[in-house]
Amino acid sequence: MRQENVTTYVRFRGDLSFKDSPFNEIDALIFTLLSYIDFKGIASYEGSITLREASEKVIALESGDPIEGHRKSAPHELELLDLAGHSKRFGDTEITYFVDELDKKEVRQFCAMHFVFERNKSFVAFRGTDDTLVGWKENFQMLYAKNVAGQIRAAEYLSETCKNDLKHLFVKYYVGGHSKGGNLAIYGVLHCDESAIKKMVKIYSFDGPGFEQPFEEMPRYQEIKDKLMTYTPKFSAFGFCLDHVRLDHTVDSFNNGLYQHDGYSWIVDGTHFKDAVRDEESKRVEANFKEWVHSIPIDHRESFVNALFDVLEESGCNSVSDFLNLNMSGVITVIKNMINIPSEERDLIIHIILFIINEDRKSKQTVDSRIVEKVENFKENLALENLKNVFNTKTDKTEKAKS
C-alpha cells in the first residue's frame, strides 16, 4: 500500500483553507516543489497570477508539441500542480516576483518566486538544481568557493522583494527551498538587508546542502536559529554535504537510497512528515564523500570542477539529460577529451562517476521511469566497469608515442 505524500495531502486536505488549517511544513515543501515548474512566460516579476490560472496555462502549454527552452514537467509534477491549482487551499495563491535566470558565464542557475497564500503572508521559494549543466557546475563550486553566484543573487532577491515599506508593512514572509534551494534560502537570509530578516517567520531547508564554513560561525545565526527548520530523509547524501547546518527533522520516505532526495517520496502523516531514524548506510556514504572531498586540496578542487564540466560541454551536453542520452559517438568524445586531462584530475572524475552510478544501482526503486531508462542507457553505452582500463590503455599508448 502506497504511503501518503504531498500529492495525497492536497487531494485529501485541499478543501481546507489556511484559516481552517494553518500553514504547516507540508505546505512549505509543496511550494518549494512547485517552484520547479517552468512558469516562464506565465508568471512575472511585476505582475501576479493565481496558481489556478498558472496551472491551467502550464498544463495547456505542455499538452502540445515540445517548446524549445521550456522544461517539460514530469507526470507527478503536473499532477501536484493540477491538484493544488484547483484546490480551495492553494488555488487562489498568487505567484509574483518571478525570476528565472541562467547565466553560463557567471555560472548561475537561479529561480525564485513569491507564493502569496494569504493576505499579508507570502512564501518565498528558491528552486533547487535543475537539469542544466550550469546548475550542476554551480553545485560543485560549493566544494571550494566561499560563495557562489546563486547565493549572492538570493540575498539580493530577498532584499529587493521582502520589503519593509508602507505597502508591505504588515506582510510576513516564509522562506524556503528544496536541495540547492534550501541552501540559497539560508544564505540569502543570512546576507540580505536587516529590515527583511525581521519580517521573516520561518526558514525551511528541505535536504539542502550545508556550507564550507561552519554554520554557527556565520553572522546572524543567533538571529535566525529559532526560525530555521531543516529536514532530511533517512538516507541523505545531499543534505550532509560539507558542513551541514543542523539536523532538526529526519523524514521517512518510500524510496531507497539517493532517490529519497525526491520530496515527492517523503511520507506525510496528517499535517506533518512521518519521523524516521537516519540510515546507517547514509552515514557511510556521507563519511566516504567527505573523506573524498577532504583528500582534495581546496586549490585543486576548482581545477577538477572546471575539467569535469569542460569535458561535458565539449561533448555537446547542455544538461544532465544530454549526458545520460549520449550515443556511442558522444561517449567516445567524452573519453577522448578526458585522455588529455592530467591523470590525477581524470581519476577524480572517474571516481565520482563510478560513485554516483554505484549508489544508483543500490538505490533504484520507485523513481521516474524516464530517469531510470536514461541512466541505464548511459551505463550501457559507457560500460563504466571497463572505463579505467580504456583510459589506462589509451594513456599508455599516448605516453609511448611521446617518448
PLM-predicted stretches and their roles:
Residues 176-181, 185:
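Gly/Ala-rich beta-loop-alpha elbow adjacent to hydrolase catalytic centers
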Residues 1-26, 31, 35-43, 49-122, ...:
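Alpha/beta hydrolase fold serine-hydrolase catalytic domain that processes acyl esters and thioesters
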Residues 185-194:
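Short glycine-enriched nucleophile-adjacent loop
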